[in-house]
UniProtKB/Swiss-Prot annotation:
This is ATP-dependent zinc metalloprotease FtsH. The lineage of its organism: Bacteria, Pseudomonadati, Chlorobiota, Chlorobiia, Chlorobiales. Keywords: ATP-binding, Cell inner membrane, Cell membrane, Hydrolase, Membrane, Metal-binding, Metalloprotease, Nucleotide-binding, Protease, Transmembrane, Transmembrane helix, Zinc. Residues 61-154 are periplasmic. The keyword Nucleotide-binding applies. In the central section; belongs to the AAA ATPase family. In the C-terminal section; belongs to the peptidase M41 family. The gene is ftsH. The keyword Lipoprotein does not apply.
Length: 662
């Protein structure tokens, strides 16, 4: 958490400094007063250490050894020779030293170890060792002798004060640290109620709206939101009110979090960032407490922005999913609803949230007054992809054969994250080959790696298996070329990539937002082309078509159940029984049609798949010679691009192979 002062507009329009948010746990450091530097914790520790040393000194001075006056060894021999000693108690230690404590038959003037004299009948003397000869000498002189096992001063000290030392250590090093007194955001029972939001200053984030592309409408909406905070008078003059919240919706990788970073870089106000998962813990009430603490910090630093990433972790619809609602999550959501638009209003505090699961969010969270604006961020179109690629390649050296426009055309369906990964993979490939510039070949190899997976050339495949794979992929290629409405082929390979032994890659010429019946049937037909080719050539089929069959069945079932493309069943939605319950708002999926209708659905799905399979058989039977030639060349070269495929197969009813390169 930074304590850098961030400037924000004052009432007079000047730029003043706002107070940095106090770190978690209150006063940072041990014995630190308000305003003291972080180094203030060290004097507290030294004070504790000095107190311990003082206790040790007092013990050694007043409680160690014996309370009798200590005399010199020569004085001890003198009183012993004069037969003044009546009894002696010997305490022996592990280092063989001993302390002799004795009594005299009458008070005598004795010389102490500090060279002074004292009239006393008691004494003590330290000797390096106590032997049997010394014991016999004392016994012969009629001295009563008693021998005890003594303990060292340190052991005695620890025995007396160890419990207190341990307690003090626990207090300073455990409890105070766990309560956050050292300034750290400790994740423990004493700081559970504290918000874990990180405050970001304008000096920390370098990302701005100039670093974001392909989402022009979203940028426009968010720029207006930022302007609400920096120049509210412009909107207040005509009665406009600042929006309470902005919800960013869209699939993963489209730039929702990047937009939040850009807001932090553009807004000259405090910016609090937190994940939705950081609210809920194992203890009840923690989530609601953290929401309260977050908004309290935000109010102290208003105007400001709060960003909650993956808000579906805490904003899920109440009472949804298996087992009913989660009480702790519901309490957290209720507190969030109150803070956003409850009895008390939060002026000049805007909440921005991001999610890729808007379908599971609670309806109370989505209403106007809380999230006033819902901005959808979808995958970019060709112009958006071109703008994104220009941003990601502005610091990379490109060869003259790289055309960004062509590269954008050859990457339909790519999200912003996919495009960033594409540029990075191309740069890594160029660096691997000691290149100075990134070429079009590098981009093509990187795109193939993303679409088809990395090559596994080290994997050993027998000639028989390679031949089977070649005919399977050749079947896909020929059926696709001779089926109307199909996607153009980009590349075919029998080099193992990812988890597959071979692959046929398709690359549409344009972005598709809707699919007609002809296109869907073409997808099913060329998906089954590999299975049909195996049956025609080898008179048997293999497990290699398992994924193709799964995809074909899924498309056919959706055509009948969801998209109303069955002539006998009509345009009726029969639901999707394959969707997991916990991903939606329903407790369970109820089949809303009869057994007879279910049977009709199965029959329609089977008819669609079998019809497409017959079409694939017809194509391959007519093109059997081309199939053998294509498979043979594929076995020899292992990979064929679009131009090579077109030279072998010639034109067909479907789309021509797509020869586009970067």
């Amino acid at each position: 958490m930074s304590e850098n002062p961030v400037k924000r507009p004052g009432k007079d329009g000047s730029r003043n400094k706002f107070k940095p948010v106090q770190e978690e746990g209150g006063t940072p450091g041990w014995f630190r007063s308000k305003g003291e530097s972080p180094q203030g914790k060290f004097p507290g520790f030294l004070l504790f250490l000095m107190a311990g040393l003082l206790m040790l000194f007092v013990f050694l001075r007043f409680f160690s050894g014996t309370d009798a006056p200590e005399i010199t060894y020569n004085e001890y021999k003198s009183v012993l020779s004069r037969a003044l000693v009546t009894e002696v108690t010997v305490k022996t230690y592990e280092d063989k030293s001993a302390i002799l404590s004795g009594k005299l038959n009458a008070p005598a003037q004795l010389q102490l170890i500090d060279k002074t004299t004292l009239q006393t009948n008691r004494f003590a003397v330290r000797v390096p060792s106590f032997t049997l000869e010394q014991a016999d000498m004392l016994t012969e002189k009629g001295v009563r002798l008693k021998v005890e096992k003594g303990s060292s001063d340190l052991n005695t000290f620890l025995a007396l004060f160890a419990p207190w030392i341990i307690f003090a250590a626990l207090y300073f090093f455990l409890f105070r640290r766990m309560s956050g007194q050292n300034g750290a955001q400790a994740k423990n029972i004493f700081s559970f109620g504290k918000s874990r939001a990180k405050m970001v200053s304008e000096f920390e984030v370098k990302t701005t709206f100039k670093d974001v592309a392909g989402v022009d409408e979203a940028i426009e909406e968010l720029q207006e939101t930022v302007e609400f905070l920096t120049n509210p008078e412009k909107f207040q003059k005509i009665g406009g009110k600042i929006p309470k919240g902005v919800l960013l919706l869209g699939p993963p990788g489209t730039g929702k979090t990047l937009l939040a970073k850009a807001i932090a870089g553009e807004a000259k106000v405090p910016f609090f960032s937190i994940s939705g998962a950081d609210f809920v813990e194992m203890f009840v009430g923690v989530g609601a407490a953290r929401v309260r603490d977050l908004f309290e910090q935000a109010k102290k630093n208003a105007p400001c922005i709060i960003f909650i990433d993956e808000i579906d972790a805490v904003g899920r619809s109440r009472g949804a999913g298996l087992g009913g609602g989660h009480d702790e999550r519901e309490q957290t959501l209720n507190q969030l609803l109150v803070e956003m638009d409850g009895f008390t209003t939060n002026e000049n505090v805007i909440l921005i949230a991001a999610t890729n699961r808007p379908d599971v969010l609670d309806s109370a969270l989505l209403r106007p007054g809380r999230f006033d604006r819902q901005i959808t961020i979808d995958k970019p179109d060709i112009r958006g992809r071109e703008a994104i690629l220009k941003i990601h390649t502005r610091n990379t050296p490109l060869d003259g054969d790289v055309d960004i426009t062509v590269l954008a055309k050859s990457s339909p369906g790519f999200s912003g994250a996919d495009l960033a990964n594409l540029v990075n993979e191309a740069a890594l490939l160029a660096a691997r080959h000691e290149q100075v510039l990134i070429t079009a070949v590098n981009f093509e190899q990187a795109r193939d790696k993303i679409l088809m997976g990395p090559e596994r050339r080290s994997m050993f495949i027998s000639d028989e298996q390679k031949k089977l794979t070649a005919y399977h992929e050749a079947g896909h290629v020929l059926v696709s070329i001779h089926t109307k409405g199909s996607d153009p082929i980009h590349k075919v390979t029998i080099i193992p990539r990812g988890r597959s032994l071979g692959l046929t890659a398709y690359l549409p010429l344009e972005d598709r937002y809707t699919h007609n019946r002809e296109y869907l049937l073409a997808m099913i037909t060329y998906a089954l082309g590999g299975r049909v080719a195996e049956e025609l050539v080898f008179q048997e089929c293999s497990t290699g078509a398992a994924n193709d069959i799964e995809k074909a069945t899924d498309i056919a079932r959706r055509m009948v159940r969801q998209w109303g493309m069955s002539e006998s069943l009509g345009p009726i939605n029969y639901g999707d029984s394959h969707k997991e319950v916990f991903l939606g708002k329903d407790y369970s999926h109820i089949r809303e049609y009869s057994e007879e209708t279910a049977l009709q659905i199965d029959v329609e799905v089977r008819n669609i798949i079998m019809g497409c399979m017959e079409n694939a058989k017809t194509v391959l039977s007519e093109q059997l010679a081309v199939l053998h030639r294509l498979a043979g060349i594929l076995i020899e070269k292992e990979s064929l691009n679009a131009r090579e495929i077109q030279e072998i197969t010639g034109p067909g009813q479907g789309a021509l192979p797509n020869p586009v390169t970067a």
